[in-house]
Amino acid sequence: MTVILPKIFSGISNVRAGMSTRIGNESNTEIGINLSYNVGDNPTRVGRNWRKFFAQVGISEHDLAVPLQCHSNNVLKVDTPGEYRECDALITNTIHVALVVTVADCVPILLFDPINRAVGAIHAGWRGTIGLIVKRAVEKMKAEYRTDPVQILAYIGPSAGVCCSEVGEEVAIMFGNKIVPYHEKKIFIDLKNENTLQLLQQGVLGNNIEVSTSCTICEKELFHSFRRDGQKSGRMRAVICMMQ
Ligand SMILES: [Zn+2]
């Protein structure tokens, strides 16, 4: 299975992080490697892919904390594995609690505070981005764990690039002056950049932010894309976990 390992966390022995793709030799189906039970894929195969992915990142499948994402801007502090409703971001300072994000175009963001030892995982689509969910996650890490943003290492993962993020006027209005006029009469938003700006405004250092250049819509061999493939699109997972 092809797994993306963020460079920003490489060399740090007590944190593990990764993101799945749709490539792997287990996938002899059209959908490719998929980690969601809710898109019509064979549950046995999804389970096998699920275990393989987390094993490859070095995380136990019993340690997962999974937000049941709803395009909110709610950030939840968790101390145990499990499923969590009504939220799109989790933070923890507990080892062996692996924070999971589920995506297919939306932006997965992973945060690590190596000084006060805390992590965060955020799902930011355009609604979450407008709702400043990344800003709220950093604020909650500051409040709960005394995190200094200057120390945070951040990963902004593969997601819809500005190249493919054309929006209608109703979304553009909500983004205000943040829209990117790309072609005449078309309006584009740049979610990776918006979330990067939220981190910078919170005091995270530019050198401490790794931004994936991959576009999930353009790179169809490697990534699932809801916008490209619709309801039956597979899903990818990103995860971060502190170890002993
Ligand atoms: Zn693209």
Where in this protein do the model-derived segments appear?
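Active-site microenvironment for binding and transforming phosphate-containing groups
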Residues: 1-244
